[in-house]
A protein has these predicted regions:
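Substrate-recognition "cap/lid" segment bordering the active-site pocket of phosphatases
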Residues: 34, 40-61, 113-144
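Mg2+-dependent phosphoryl-transfer enzymes with acidic/Ser/Thr/Gly-rich catalytic loops
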Residues: 124, 129-219
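Charged, glycine-interspersed solvent-exposed loop segments at helix/strand-loop junctions
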Residues: 73-90, 111-122
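Short amphipathic alpha-helices in soluble, non-transmembrane regions
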Residues: 59-63, 95-105
Length: 219
């Protein structure tokens, strides 16, 4: 799909870029990790939102101290962001939300981002929507119609941006959304992407054929 679209394919996730590269190996795509707090463009240049070491350390200490009171909850430190997971301890959702809100009150440069069984604390102004906006201002994405697929609450900011740009926003699975389209699950996503890839490849082949015929007529 990346080849058929001349490289205009990016992975945008709450995961770190290191994790995304490991998942996509051996391929190397433009990426936006940690909800846009870190991004790599088509040329390999990285764009990172840095959190001062002292602030990152103080937040980490507070979170580690408090989360120990909630068995089953997990803290994931991402450098400039922190994720409080409660999939294995849903009874602690309210307590962890309160904890995250307290952190953002102490450090107003941080913001909350809710997801599926997780609440994240990230630098204010970062989102998947902002990452899409940045990509759409750069080659090879500029001038194209964006298509964005996602299955989480954190993807809603991306859907909003894509809708505003006149693109195609696709929600995977159930749940309220501002996406314009919906696919039931991962198997449907694979089928849809394969269909798009085939269509793009055929278009490229047709263009080559047209170019060859035009050249032949000119000699």
């Amino acid at each position: 799909l990346a080849t058929a679209s001349d490289g205009a394919l990016a992975l945008i996730s709450g995961r770190s870029m290191v994790e995304l590269d490991a998942l996509a190996k051996p391929y190397r795509f433009p990426l936006a990790g940690v909800h846009g707090a870190e991004r790599r463009d088509i040329n390999g240049k990285t764009h990172i939102v840095h959190l001062p070491d002292a602030i990152a350390r103080d937040i980490s200490v507070q979170l580690h101290t408090v989360i120990a009171q909630y068995p089953g909850a997990e803290l994931e430190a991402k450098g400039m962001a922190f994720a409080l997971h409660y999939r294995q301890a849903p009874q602690h959702e309210d307590a962890l939300m309160t904890l995250a809100q307290r952190i953002t009150q102490i450090w107003p440069q941080m913001a909350l981002q809710q997801g599926k069984c997780v609440v994240e604390i990230k630098p204010k102004g970062t989102s998947k929507g902002e990452a899409i906006t940045a990509f759409m201002q750069e080659a090879p994405f500029i001038g194209r119609t964006p298509v964005f697929l996602g299955d989480d609450l954190t993807d809603e900011s991306g859907f909003a941006v894509v809708n505003r740009l006149g693109g195609m926003s696709v929600k995977i699975g159930t749940g309220a959304t501002q996406a314009s389209w919906r696919l039931a699950g991962v198997p449907d996503v694979w089928s849809w992407l394969e269909m798009i890839t085939t269509a793009l490849q055929q278009k490229r082949e047709n263009n080559r054929s047209d170019d060859y015929e035009s050249f032949s007529r000119s000699i």
